[in-house]
């Protein structure tokens, strides 16, 4: 994917030349601990206990989805931090208790609880992803109140799955708080808009034709690279089409 930015780019690189300034481009996957990746991405006999080290030798970032389903101990994040290179970046999905149970309301205490163990990642914490339920309709007051609960100086992105979030008021709220609108390719299932609302870009590629299970063609990857070049910001790109590794 990075080869489309300049001739000397490779998968291990996280810096590209946009032609104007140097921006960081982080490319990774949504998770790394998949059984069906053995023999496809990971060598057949490579020990599972070393998969993270192998992964972080190939990619500069990963998106953690397990935190959406359950809380994790600080020791887990500390372990991950120690096992990855200094330049590695972790993006972490927020708890579904915040997004799907509380639905962004009265979220101050849950946010503090969620963030506390994440501090163990230190400077390797990249972006906090809030994946909203398809039934959650945009409410400006709810969003503004929730934004007051967000940690200072931490990058956040919202993946909205209801069409009401496409309206300008929602995007203006994101801009006010420097929150990235998650540009999410979901094979047409959920709202799609290439909106730039912060000083960084966050892209989730779930599959262009079949959700979670379709590969991206060379032409599609080239098109995405051209868009990223044009947006000219730090960018996080995660592939969530993990069916065949």
Residue ranges and their predicted role:
Residues 1, 5-18:
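Short, basic, low-complexity termini and linkers enriched in Ser/Thr/Gly/Pro
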